Amino acid sequence: MLELFFEYIFPLIIIALKVVAITIPLILCVAYLTYAERRVIGLMQLRRGPNVVGPFGLLQPIADAVKLLFKEPIIPTNADKILFILAPMITFILSLIGWAVIPFAKGVVLADINVGVLYILAISSLSVYGIIIAGWASNSKYAFLGAIRSSAQMISYEVSMGLVIITVLLTTGTLNLSEIIEAQRTIPWWIDLMLLPMGVVFFISVLAETNRLPFDLPEAESELVAGYNVEYSSMGFALFFLGEYANMILVSAMTTTFFLGGYLPPFNISWLDCIPGFFWFVFKVGFLLFCFLWIRATLPRYRYDQLMRLGWKVFLPLTLFWVVLVSSVLVYTDNLPSI
């Protein structure tokens, strides 16, 4: 009986504890990211932001959570009730399970699989389903238009993101995210410089992927009231909200992993290795999240035709050309990694 416990049940308990250890801090990070957003944008707009609930307004996310928890969930009369309820759950769950393959520090990863990049791409592609289901099930023209915009936008920029990731795979020679980070220790500086434009393209693409300004067309308040989640209240709205901000943190972690060295120090200086890798990972993700907030506070929204033109007529040809350029240079200089 004891052997059965240690062979089958104990590993499941360990996995469950790991999942809880990632999920609870992530939800807390999402909650306080909303607080940070309001404070940062407030400072940029010369106002104070939330400062009443608790010292410096630090309890504001808890107050917001309690408010949403006790609000009445209202389902439209003609809505498809089952899909209407499932849609925010799908969005929120998909935003969490993407973290399974992200390395927080050396050896600190829930599932260190050899196809981590494919897993991340698959999960990010699936996230559009929660939004399109919400728009369809709401039986509202505003929600449906927002959902169609979102699906078209996410599919358009997925192509560019995939091609950008191919350039990273060409230089590292692996689909394992931990090995991609370790490969960045030894990559020559000129290859890093060659990948820099692709890092910028990737970051702009994930702005569109997460429906953030200046690409928040699916939620355009002046055109679609609130987009695909216009009919949601209470916990349904809260789950969409949590999913959006969890996706922001996830894509920041992806950008850090692919282009900023993950948990590695930013410079090859011996004393920087004394600082734990987790600190560097959090620092880099935090910097990218600040860029998200900075962009929201300063840039206006794109028109929809401008958004599509940027994706299909600028980013797609550019990333295709860069894949050919990187592969040609790696072959010519004999730096193509063995897979």
Swiss-Prot record:
Transmembrane helix found in the keyword field: yes
Main location: membrane
Reactions catalysed according to its record: a quinone + NADH + 5 H(+)(in) = a quinol + NAD(+) + 4 H(+)(out)
Keywords linked to the UniProt accession: Cell inner membrane, Cell membrane, Membrane, NAD, Quinone, Translocase, Transmembrane, Transmembrane helix, Ubiquinone
Membrane spanning stretches: 9-29, 50-70, 82-102, 115-135, 161-181, 187-207, 235-255, 275-295, 311-331
EC number: 7.1.1.-
Pfam families: NADHdh (PF00146)
GO cellular component: plasma membrane
Highest taxon of source: Bacteria
Cell compartments where the protein resides: Cell inner membrane
InterPro entries: NADH_UbQ_OxRdtase_su1/FPO, NADH_UbQ_OxRdtase_su1_CS
One record GO biological process: aerobic respiration
Topology term for the membrane: Multi-pass membrane protein
GO MF annotation: an example: NADH dehydrogenase activity
Function: NDH-1 shuttles electrons from NADH, via FMN and iron-sulfur (Fe-S) centers, to quinones in the respiratory chain. The immediate electron acceptor for the enzyme in this species is believed to be ubiquinone. Couples the redox reaction to proton translocation (for every two electrons transferred, four hydrogen ions are translocated across the cytoplasmic membrane), and thus conserves the redox energy in a proton gradient. This subunit may bind ubiquinone.
Subunit structure: NDH-1 is composed of 14 different subunits. Subunits NuoA, H, J, K, L, M, N constitute the membrane sector of the complex.
HAMAP family per the UniProt record, alphabetical: NDH1_NuoH (MF_01350)
Family the UniProt entry places it in: Belongs to the complex I subunit 1 family.
NCBIfam families: PRK06076.1-2, PRK06076.1-6
Protein name per UniProt: NADH-quinone oxidoreductase subunit H
Species this chain originates from: Rickettsia rickettsii (strain Sheila Smith)
